[in-house]
Amino acid sequence: MSEINTANVGKETQVGAFLVRGGALDVDYCYDDEKKELEILTEIPLIISNKKPEKETGTDIIMNRNQEYHITLENVNLTDETHRGGVRIRNGKAVITLRGINFIRGGINLTNAESAQLEITKESGGFTHVCGIGGTYKEIVINGGNIKAVGGAYAAGIGGGLREGAGNITINGGTLEAIGTGWGNSNGIGCGQWGSGGTITINGGHVRAFGGSTGGSNPPLPKVCGIGGDNVHILVNGGVVEGYGNNGGSDFGGIFRTAPDGNARVTGSIEDTLDKENWNGIINDEVMGRVILGEDTYIDRLTVAKDAELLIPGGMILVNYGTLVNYGKITVWDNPGIPSKSCICNKGEIRNSGVIDGWNENGSVQTV
């Protein structure tokens, strides 16, 4: 990648309904008033906003060249009128930061080239409503942000369109709600209607995904998943992950796995249980394998399976409002050098037929 010149960042130019900060018009970006397209030309970082955020525009943002793009969408309000995507990445990799409140109706679409990639940065903040993230060829990485992605007709909220697979989707963080909707059935995250294949990896964040259905029955519509789809490989390593299927589909459909050191909290029915003995995480309120809490956790019900272990490290608390059932081992563990204590704060009932152990005098079970 060539060195990025940031000398012009901060300048503001109006192009159509947008304000662009950074770069120079007709050098780093250009505007076609007839086509209503803002095309990004170089790697220089750009900040794009609506001049009037309360008023939506029909102008699309497009990236055609095989290079790395760096753009920030800040209070963008656009509606795609071409049905090809409000933000279109034809070639290259787009690194996008989301700020403020963004509405992208028509979605973020990766089209026509296997080289097209999308990365949403962990610096993203505010709230973004996107009508679908995906396309024909997809390499999608979401590192942060507060994003709601709603699929169009036959399309997943994040992933494929009609007869398309999921592509390669990685979620590392953020708060994400994905809904498959539009005319016909589609998965929340995964394949579009009648699509097959792809991979979904979830390493962190709070993810909620809903399979959608809004009508049509000839031919009969397929079952849809919250996350996955036909022959989709799902690897859940961390975060809080909820799936909600539709039309008789599982909440998680496809080939389901966890990492050997996974600590995700997963909620939803899982179609594929062939690897269940190797699952590691809190899955449907049951601790499986060896799980180290990565954040304060609040439960109404939790069971630690036989031969499973739940470790609560220094600075973390487990708050029980309902029933905690332990058949395995719970370790309350204070790390040297971390001043805050770890504990189980019990506001309900603990049923223990296993071991609850503290690694030193600070580890505690506190009943409130």
Regions found by a protein language model. Give the residues of each.
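A composition-driven surface/loop motif
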Residues: M1-V368
